[in-house]
Amino acid sequence: SSAASDVYKRQVYTMPATGGEPLRITYTATNSRDDLGDRMGPNNIVMTWTPDGQRIVYRNRISDGFSGKLFTVDKEGGLSEVIPLPEGGFCSYSPDGKQLAYNRVMREFRTWKYYKGGMADDIWVYNPGNKTVENVTNNVAQDIFPMWIGDEIFFLSDRDRIMNIFAYNTKTKQTVKVTNFTEYDV
């Protein structure tokens, strides 16, 4: 591929639901580590939208190619704003938009099964109002892809050796298994 096309394929775009021309939202630099997409996910990957639908959250790995930082950018474009966390992966806002459930380490694209090492992901909750983070899963297995719905944060985990859906209740602080696949990952 040409150098020009490489620049464009690692940016964030929006497209009208009815079709039409895509609108380029980000103008971030790329780096020589962009080839790590299979291991770390693509650079500038969209993680979610803010609950008000006005901003896009994406992860950028430009600092060193390995550590992903979360940014937001207006859906019409403009300057990106960093979410003040050391690093971040997939994430989901609380329904009121006041907290963010996220993975600190970006390992969601790794193919290792039942990894329990020091880089295993947990689900953390960031509260920008009081500038705190809390590990809500604190499990040695992979806990990834948080999705905050109501009072629960749903996520995937292989804590029982097979990847299933679990839910953490933010009121009771209890985690329950939602699916029970026993042969293949959900």
Functional labels for PLM-detected ranges:
Residues 1-8:
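Short, small-residue-biased leader/transition segments that mark boundaries at the very start
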Residues 5, 53-56, 100, 153-154:
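Hydrophobic beta-strand positions that form the internal "hydrophobic ladder"
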Residues 5, 36, 58-65, 102-119:
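Short, conserved, GDST-rich strand-edge loop motifs in beta-rich repeat architectures
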Residues 9-13, 65-71, 110-114, 119-123, ...:
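Structural motif
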Residues 16-20, 74-78, 127-131, 169-173:
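Short loop/turn segments that connect beta-strands within beta-propeller blades
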Residues 23-26, 32-37, 79-83, 132-137, ...:
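A short beta-strand motif characteristic of beta-propeller blades
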Residues 28-34, 85-91, 139-144, 181-186:
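Short coil/turn segments at the loop-to-beta-strand junctions that recur within blades
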Residues 51-52, 95-96, 148-150:
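Residue-level detector of Asp-centered blade-edge/turn motifs that repeat once per structural unit
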